[in-house]
């Protein structure tokens, strides 16, 4: 079918009609690649409650809604995924993964769409990608024990270390309490105070400098529906928090999002102990997949028994915004070719930090 038949309309998330909302939910339900809570309409609604720039590019073909591209649109035409730095996974809500996104954006106010975690199965993102990488996941469809056995066969040494820490904690004589659905607001506050301290300590970008991001976490914590739930899980040792995790889940997928641990309990590997308990509990509560996200991180590679490809890059049309972004990318590429060692990466890191700030503040 000719992609030229597609027409587009940019609509605030809050302005979607009842028919459009039904189409969103229907297409997501029919597409297994959209099972992540990130693709739930309710997640878009929560973002829209906190950000005035939350929009959806509605794609229509022959009078039928063909898809939605949720985005945050800046005043100078740069579109980014909903949630900005919090948007680990994003993409088209559609039942047709071959839609021509370039053609769709040409008729919109968005001159550039920056993406960093879009399904590579959606050909519009794959064609425009500068990088495609695996997003790691834990497949629990055969149960938690089957996953652990799979990991033992893949890396026996890693699993021996995990079991040794489990025994060390179990035999410590300490009072151990797991709360897999911790509804205490004070535990949530302590979790994110620790997370933000971790960001400061490691010089990582703290997205929670933006009030909307802090408010979104509170909203998710209170939001409890089958399609979208904020989930706080904690491990306490002798009545003190030792590890915590805040994520969100849909009917079948948990997105592993903000894990933290308290350094004084590091010898017990509390974060990993908590994740194992979460996997066992949630496998019996409808969760068949835990999304760990992309990244060359040791624990993700060791624990994941599945993955799917995600794409990063830009879809753009000629514009001032596109030219500025292309110039920045060119400067980064030039610097990386110079014999400067680690210094050669500084321009790219600075540009990435600026882009993250822009996404956080809607610039």
Predicted segments with their positions:
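Active-site/acyl-donor-binding loops of N-acyltransferases
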Residues: 2-7, 122-153, 251, 284-347, ...
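Short loop segments at secondary-structure junctions
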Residues: 62-63, 96-97, 139-143, 238, ...
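A short, structural micro-pattern
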Residues: 86, 107-109, 129-132, 172, ...
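A gly/proline- and charged-residue-enriched helix-loop-helix capping module
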Residues: 84-109
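ATP-hydrolysis module of ASCE/P-loop NTPase motor domains
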Residues: 106-123
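A conserved beta-strand-loop-helix scaffold within acyl/acetyltransferase catalytic domains
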Residues: 8-62, 66-79, 118-123, 127-135, ...
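Aromatic (often tryptophan-rich) hydrophobic motifs at membrane interfaces
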Residues: 77, 99-107, 207-325
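Acyl-group handling in specialized metabolite and lipid biosynthesis
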Residues: 89-94, 147-150, 179-181
